[in-house]
UniProtKB/Swiss-Prot annotation:
Organism this protein belongs to: Saccharomyces cerevisiae (strain ATCC 204508 / S288c) (Baker's yeast)
Molecular function via GO: enzyme regulator activity; ubiquitin protein ligase binding
Modified sites of kind Phosphothreonine: 801, 932
Single GO biological process annotation from the record: proteasome assembly
Job description of the protein: Acts as a regulatory subunit of the 26S proteasome which is involved in the ATP-dependent degradation of ubiquitinated proteins.
UniProt modified residues of type N-acetylserine: 2
GO CC annotations on file: nucleus; proteasome complex; proteasome regulatory particle, base subcomplex; proteasome storage granule
Repeat (PC) residue spans along the chain: 366-399, 403-440, 445-479, 480-514, 516-549, 550-585, 586-618, 620-654, 655-692, 698-734
Subunit structure: Interacts with UBR1.
Protein name: 26S proteasome regulatory subunit RPN2
Compositional bias (Basic and acidic residues): 820-851
Amino acid sequence: MSLTTAAPLLALLRENQDSVKTYALESINNVVDQLWSEISNELPDIEALYDDDTFSDREMAALIASKVYYNLGEYESAVKYALAAKDRFDIDEKSQFVETIVSKSIEMYVQEASKQYTKDEQFYTKDIIDPKLTSIFERMIEKCLKASELKLALGIALEGYRLDIIESALKSKLDQDSTSENVKIINYLLTLAITTVTNSKFRSSILRKSFDFLMNMPNCDYLTLNKVVVNLNDAGLALQLFKKLKEENDEGLSAQIAFDLVSSASQQLLEILVTELTAQGYDPALLNILSGLPTCDYYNTFLLNNKNIDIGLLNKSKSSLDGKFSLFHTAVSVANGFMHAGTTDNSFIKANLPWLGKAQNWAKFTATASLGVIHKGNLLEGKKVMAPYLPGSRASSRFIKGGSLYGLGLIYAGFGRDTTDYLKNIIVENSGTSGDEDVDVLLHGASLGIGLAAMGSANIEVYEALKEVLYNDSATSGEAAALGMGLCMLGTGKPEAIHDMFTYSQETQHGNITRGLAVGLALINYGRQELADDLITKMLASDESLLRYGGAFTIALAYAGTGNNSAVKRLLHVAVSDSNDDVRRAAVIALGFVLLRDYTTVPRIVQLLSKSHNAHVRCGTAFALGIACAGKGLQSAIDVLDPLTKDPVDFVRQAAMIALSMILIQQTEKLNPQVADINKNFLSVITNKHQEGLAKFGACVAQGIMNAGGRNVTIQLENADTGTLDTKSVVGLVMFSQFWYWFPLAHFLSLSFTPTTVIGIRGSDQAIPKFQMNCYAKEDAFSYPRMYEEASGKEVEKVATAVLSTTARAKARAKKTKKEKGPNEEEKKKEHEEKEKERETNKKGIKETKENDEEFYKNKYSSKPYKVDNMTRILPQQSRYISFIKDDRFVPVRKFKGNNGVVVLRDREPKEPVALIETVRQMKDVNAPLPTPFKVDDNVDFPSA
């Protein structure tokens, strides 16, 4: 029979004999879940029993106290007494009480571990945290390991900063399982470390430990090793990786890893690696790959051979926007650059020299720099292309000279070893005469150019040369120098650079320079997360709005792609509370960067902000959506942006149109039926005389983005192979968003363009063979959009025929007579029935078409594949349907996972001839390569003459 009151048992606690008290406690423990409210009145007596050192069953008293506190909702006290209960508290018991206490214990341990790790990495060896709390934490992990829940154990150990537990768990796992299972577990650990661990030091320790485990495996997973190298940005580990590959004598895989590093590693890592490998006598072909030259050459070749440029659309924009106005001339220059980006095709400029001649001052600077966008990645011919416009040439305009230096940087962005010295010499030669108008324009272009060329290289000489320009305190050259310094030191977090730039930002009287330094500081702190917090706090607390503006972008870059909650809260607070419109706009834009990986949540988060009374906040919302959802075609983002394209404020419409183009880049009408209407809207804005200039600018640039790179590039912010953010793409978007103040910075978006192709190359000689792959999709699902077609001609206006007055009167009388008689009833009924029938047929046809279209959009898979040529356009949405043909001559050196980029192939029939694709570099190479070896048959019968 169950007890209805605990009074008799509680009375026994006042007895003198310990055995009676023990009996009472054990009995109370059985009913505490039902009668806890009554027992809570005697809680002081139960606690007193626990505090009595002479009492033999103190642990039972602690357990009861814990259960009472648990039911009262006081979890900290409940955990305290549960820990004191020692073995009486059974963590294996299946009850809500035990689950809650264990959960709260782990939470408390994690909080303490987080605090202690920053002070001492070996905190767990020194009993700094309550040993009882540590005991529950460790017992829980043991329980997980016994139940073969290794992933759960690793997750808990990661949260508790216990590298020792992770190491021992992995060691035992690696000894038991196969290599493939072990690689899966380490990949899981890496994903957790990269996406959830907030402490940079601890994350680095995990990655290094994972690298050691992978290197000691019998069959190395080089893709995972490469992922660790890129995330740590450590050239030393990269050297170890290539050393192991050399020992295994796998040239094909070495080449593939080198190509992967070129697409994802920093310029600093690549330069150190090339220097070290050269000193150690590595294969020149491998060193050539690491220089970036082959990758850029392949991409230029793909973009040139497959260009699908809508010249008609560009010409329509040019003719609709008067080139006399620098705003419109700049818009067309930027759009032209984007549409031809990387194709090395400057035919539009050559065909429109009179239009080009209309450019004045900075519009001339932007137009010249657009050549750099067109020839992006043309590392071999870049300087030759820009030679007619560079200082020392016959070019008379200072804006052309400055623009050419900026363009040179755009060509060599991230691969600037061959041009850095040239640009540095120009800066050094001219920095002494800074302040002169001609020299300032030159230094402006050179500073931006060298920032691009030396991006992420941490080159001290470049930094010092730019600092010299900055300290001359000229608004024009100083702003560009500040941005160049940030680009050069990208992601390094160098304390001296941060100190120099922050101090000078408070001293200078030029707003342009302060803003340049603020954005430069953000660039230096790229990817540094909590290590940038002190600087962020200082910047956001500043009275100078331009520094607060930079503070928002510092959060954006320091926490890019992390989805960090505290960063999001901070930005939302600034977005709704700051007194300055520019700062509020920057804070909303920054949300897009922080939530890059969680892009599906962005429309929901910014939806209310898109309806803000403040136009700058609405503008920031548009950019945030464009950045976070770039290249994704996300419908919920389009739904938020659509009303903003009709906003009453011109710059909000501008931002909305640009954001839509970034989201819908490489989308066709078949992938998204809204694309056609959006393109029509862009064109109608450009051609409408009543639209404001800023809206027209936005529509023109948006057209350029939608058709970028000859319709063969997308904006890809994450590297699928390594799981890291694409640094160039992120930097390109940050700098592009600064075009609000300075239109020439719009060219930076070209850094974010990634060619949409799979380029299969032969590992033995890096040649591109002609072969085909399978695509298991409907053949026309991913075809190019239709080209713009202007209406064939206007209808000829009909001229009224002269009519005599007598004829007119006769016609009027006849009409009146007919009206009086009225139509035949049967005729009326017949006519009505025919109209109804026609309407029903139309409705049915429209419905069927719509259903067919929807079915097509949803299901693109086809069981019967069609063939796709090597080095042709393969959209990101299409790549999942691509596979190499089974038992084909060319097979990838590692498993193909549907990612775009360079794929190294193993040739199964190396002695057989094969047709090759000629690259841009080979087309212009006067020293033709040796022909493929061939046999001459001695017994050849030549026909007689």
